[in-house]
Swiss-Prot record:
Its main location: periplasm. Residues 1-25 form the signal peptide. It catalyses: L-glutamine + H2O = L-glutamate + NH4(+); L-asparagine + H2O = L-aspartate + NH4(+). It is an enzyme of class 3 (hydrolase). The gene is ansB. The keyword Signal applies. It comes from Pseudomonas aeruginosa (strain ATCC 15692 / DSM 22644 / CIP 104116 / JCM 14847 / LMG 12228 / 1C / PRS 101 / PAO1). The keyword Hydrolase applies. This is Glutaminase-asparaginase. GO terms for molecular function: asparaginase activity; glutamin-(asparagin-)ase activity; glutaminase activity. One of its GO terms (cellular component) is periplasmic space.
Amino acid sequence: MKPLLHAFAPGVMALMLLLPQAAQAKEVAPQQKLSNVVILATGGTIAGAGASAANSATYTAAKVPVDQLLASVPQLKDIANVRGEQVFQIASESFTNENLLELGKTVAKLADSDDVDGIVITHGTDTLEETAYFLTLVEHTEKPIVVVGSMRPGTAMSADGMLNLYNAVAVAGDKSARGKGVLITMNDEILSGRDASKMVNIKTEAFKSPWGPLGMVVEGKSYWFRAPVKRHTVNSEFDIKQISALAPVEIAYSYGNVSDTAYKALAQAGAKAIIHAGTGNGSVPARVVPTLQELRKQGVQIIRSSHVNAGGFVLRNAEQPDDKNDWIVAHDLNPQKARILAAVAMTKTQDSKELQRIFWEY
C-alpha cells in the first residue's frame, strides 16, 4: 500500500506553493487610510508645566506650545495624520467672548475643508465646558469636534494629558463620531459638550454629565452607549459665520441672605440678560423677587437656573410664577452653560417666549 501522503502529493504540493503567495498578498495589502485631524491648541493645564514631577496641582498653565505637545505623544501618528495650530496660549479662566468667536470661526473654516476629517481643541478645564457648548450651538458640521484638557500638567507624575489627547484624536478621526455634536474626552469617557461639566478640581475624573457619558475610548477605539437628542451643530439655527458679537449676559449667584445688589449692578452695567444661579429649583429669595420683576419690566431677561452640583432641573412655574413674571427657565443647563445659550440666542431674538423655546430645544 502506498503512503497516504504520496497519494495526495500533487494536491499537497499545490497548496504549499500557494501558501507563501497568500501570506505575501496579505503583507502587501493596503493599510486603512488614516483620518486627517487638526489639533487647535489654546493653552490650559494640558499645556502646563510644574517645577518638578511632584507638582500636580501647583504649576504654570499655558506654557508648552502645540508642536511640543504633539511630540510628547508620538503614538498619534499611528491613528491619524495630525497637524497642530496654536490659536491661543492662555489659561481658560481668561477666555472671553471674543476668544470664543475667534475659535469658533477657526473651527468653521477647518470644518469646511475637504482635507480635514476631524478637529481636536486642547483647552484649559476651567471653562472647557462653556467652549464645548458654544461650539455645539454654532458649528454647522457633522465632522467630529472634540474638546480635551487635563487635570495635571505634562510634567507631573501620572499625568493624564497624553492619554486624553490620544483618545481625543482617536475619536475625532472616527467616522462613528460624526453627527454627535461637539464632544469632550476626559478620563477615557466620551461626554456630550452640551451637558458635561467640571465637577471637581483636583481629580482626573473631573468631568461628568448628570445624564452619563455618550461612550468610552479604550486603546483608541470608541464604544458608544447613547446619542444626544437636543439640537446641535448641523441642526442648530445658529451659525458662527453669521455672529459678530455675543449678547452681554451675566450671572448672579444666589445663597442664604442674598441681597439684590448684584442684580442691580449687572443691569446697570449693561447686561441684557441675567442668569439667576439659584438654589434648588432655581429658587428666588423673597427679598430679590421685586427687583427681578422690575428689571424684567425694564427689558432685562431673567433666566432661572440652579447651581446644585450634580445637575439642576428647573421647571417653569415651580417655585416662581414664571408665566406671570415673564421669566425664562434654563431647564437642565447649569448657570455657565445657560449664559452661553442666552448670549448666542439673543443675537437672533429678544422675545422671552422664543428664548424659552430655545432653552427647551437646546
